[in-house]
């Protein structure tokens, strides 16, 4: 891990140690000189011989009118002082400064020596490579990100509240994708908000959303020397989520003693091991054992991880007896050392561990697929990523059982001899899900296979699910092939009416009544979402919308502080603020937590600020999953 900066710092440290050693030696010599015995030479022998008296120079008379050729010159000898002739004077140490003993120096870590000798780095980047904090993010506007200056004139307090107040769990897959894009964009900080703190709030929300890789990219876009306390905290959480434990080491090296908590002490010691001081680091971790700093299981996992950096390679036995819960660093150290967490602990664990497993390359493929069954519905994994994962499972001959069977079904969904064979394989993948969320993840998985299905009457009964599967991956063009076959008032028709890029004629009240009469969802939720989406997209006239909303006993014009804020953001054409506020309005663990009023304002605001494609997908998803 040592780079050019570490090498230069090591040279400086050695030079400083030599200088410190010289001071120690010189101070010792002075003490010896003060306590030396009296001279044994006879009196006078230790005194320098007096210099002979110097003769006065003879006066020189200059004759008037004499020329330069006739003048006499007297050479004056140049006397140069002999080096060392002057009495040496020891440079005094500042008052209150104590020189460490040799034993203390030997016990110091490299970071402590750097701090003692004034070699502590102020940045993890050389001067020529340091980056501006003006725009922090990973997506420029020409790469699909939002406009950089969208928040420059906005209130920092409002933006902070929208980010910090979001718990990270959104009901909509497409809402999650949109918010991730907004958070990862290269943006100027809003007024009155430190750019590093702005990056911290975005990274922290991405971690809560399960987007560890995006969060890590955000914190890595800021030089460690510019970190604030909040950004340091967000970075620790991001590296824990991705199990990239040594990724935090540059931050710890620069921030040094900024924190003294147990987490920081353990991570600092682990980083010390990977900086080449393995023996001292392992000894320090040994002293932290016994539950004094971290729980015993966490200290053992940290020792196992740090031990990989040293030459000793000592064995560490991990015993899970008595461990009742999973924690972020416990999980990170477990998968980073190649271990599998106990199944009993993972059954009741939070979704963040499933999301982490789905993205972690060191986790077994079957465990990743199990995590993907949750991550895809949330919006963390794309359809292409799911297909790639199942393809790896199919290629592994040593994987058997349910996951092997599912990978074979996915292959049949693409390569079945007849459309009926392909449809049967797709249906088996859907129906094999244990709950609606997993079923929707399987729809994400089969999106491209669904797009290859022919539009035939024999598949009309599955058309709503086929369309929902295609729209889960944004394949609206493929889904619209079913428009001619879709019966007005059906679920297929409702999804396509919302997902279509444009619509010439507004939806009639008769079509809405037909959909309402066949709506079996709880409290007519699908009908509520349909009218909210159509009104937000402007695809139904106001009178028809008002009449249908009245029948459903909803008031789309009801105002709250949130509705006023997102409407004002749309009025000034601010897509970034609209996205952040839409994220606030989409929080929940299921579509039963979404209201038709919130959906209407979200779809309307997104459509007005140029995010019509996202608005259409969110509206169609709401009807499909409501």
Feature map (PLM): residue ranges:
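Residue-level signature for tetratricopeptide repeat
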Residues: 205, 234-239, 271-272, 468-469, ...
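N-terminal, Lys/Arg-enriched amphipathic/low-complexity engagement segments
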Residues: 126-192, 198, 202
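N-terminal propeptides/low-complexity segments immediately following signal peptides
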Residues: 33-101
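N-terminal signal peptide c-region/cleavage motif recognized by signal peptidases
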Residues: 26-30
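Long, internal scaffold/assembly segments composed of regular secondary structure
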Residues: 300-475
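Extended amphipathic alpha-helical segments with heptad-repeat/coiled-coil character used for oligomerization
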Residues: 247-341, 496, 500
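Generic helix N-cap/helix-start motif at coil->alpha-helix transitions
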Residues: 192-199, 224-233, 258-267, 280, ...
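Solenoid-like repeat scaffolds
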Residues: 143-153, 167-168, 183-192, 219-227, ...
């Amino acid at each position: 891990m040592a780079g050019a900066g570490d090498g230069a710092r090591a040279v400086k440290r050695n030079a400083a140690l030599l200088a410190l050693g010289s001071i120690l030696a010189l101070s010792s010599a002075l003490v010896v000189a003060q306590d030396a015995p009296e001279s044994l030479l006879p009196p006078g022998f230790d005194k320098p011989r007096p210099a002979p008296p110097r003769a006065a120079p003879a006066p020189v008379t200059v004759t008037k009118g004499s020329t330069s050729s006739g003048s006499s010159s007297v050479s004056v000898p140049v006397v140069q002082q002999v080096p060392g002739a002057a009495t040496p004077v020891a440079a005094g140490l500042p008052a209150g400064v104590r020189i460490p003993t040799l034993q203390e120096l030997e016990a110091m870590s490299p970071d402590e020596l750097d701090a003692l000798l004034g070699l502590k780095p102020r940045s993890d980047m050389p001067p020529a490579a340091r980056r501006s904090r003006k725009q922090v993010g990973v997506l420029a506007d020409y790469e699909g990100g939002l406009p950089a200056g969208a928040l420059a004139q906005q209130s920092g307090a409002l933006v902070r509240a929208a980010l910090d107040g979001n718990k990270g769990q959104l009901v909509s897959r497409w809402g999650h994708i949109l918010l991730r894009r907004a958070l990862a964009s290269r943006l100027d900080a809003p007024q009155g908000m430190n750019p590093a703190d702005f990056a911290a709030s975005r990274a922290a929300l991405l971690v809560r959303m399960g987007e560890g890789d995006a969060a890590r990219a955000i914190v890595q876009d800021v030089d460690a020397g510019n970190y604030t306390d909040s950004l340091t905290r967000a970075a620790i959480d991001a590296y824990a989520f991705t199990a990239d434990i040594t990724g935090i080491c540059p931050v710890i090296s620069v921030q040094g003693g900024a924190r003294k908590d147990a987490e920081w002490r353990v991570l600092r010691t682990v980083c010390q091991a990977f900086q080449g001081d393995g023996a001292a680091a392992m000894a320090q971790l040994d002293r932290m054992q016994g539950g004094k700093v971290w729980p015993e299981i966490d200290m053992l996992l940290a020792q196992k991880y740090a031990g990989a950096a040293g030459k000793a390679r000592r064995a560490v036995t991990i015993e899970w007896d008595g461990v009742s819960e999973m924690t972020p660093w416990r999980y990170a150290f477990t998968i980073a050392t190649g271990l599998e967490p106990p199944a009993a602990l993972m059954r009741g664990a939070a979704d963040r561990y499933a999301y982490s497993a789905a993205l972690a390359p060191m986790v077994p493929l079957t465990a990743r697929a199990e995590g993907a069954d949750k991550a895809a519905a949330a919006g963390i994994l794309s359809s292409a990523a799911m297909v790639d994962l199942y393809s790896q499972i199919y290629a592994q001959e040593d994987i058997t059982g349910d996951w092997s069977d599912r990978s074979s079904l996915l292959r049949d969904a693409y390569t079945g001899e007849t459309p009926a064979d392909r449809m049967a394989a797709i249906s088996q993948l859907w129906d094999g899900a244990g709950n609606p969320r997993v079923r929707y993840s399987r729809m994400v998985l089969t999106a491209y296979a669904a797009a290859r299905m022919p539009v035939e009457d024999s598949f009309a009964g599955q058309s709503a699910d086929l369309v929902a599967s295609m729209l889960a991956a944004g394949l609206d063009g493929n889904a619209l092939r079913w428009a001619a076959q879709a019966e007005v008032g059906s679920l297929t028709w409702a999804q396509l009416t919302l997902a279509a890029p444009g619509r010439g004629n507004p939806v009639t009240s008769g079509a809405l009544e037909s959909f309402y009469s066949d709506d079996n969802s709880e409290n007519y939720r699908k009908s509520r979402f349909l009218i909210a989406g159509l009104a937000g997209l402007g695809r139904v006239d106001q009178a028809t919308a008002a009449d249908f909303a009245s029948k459903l006993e909803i008031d789309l014009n009801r105002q709250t502080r949130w509705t006023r804020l997102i409407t004002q953001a749309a009025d000034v054409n601010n897509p970034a603020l609209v996205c952040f506020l839409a994220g606030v309005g989409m929080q929940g663990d299921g579509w039963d937590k979404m209201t038709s009023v919130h959906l209407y304002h979200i779809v309307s605001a997104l459509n007005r600020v140029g995010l019509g494609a996202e608005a259409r997908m969110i509206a169609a998803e709401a009807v499909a999953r409501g």
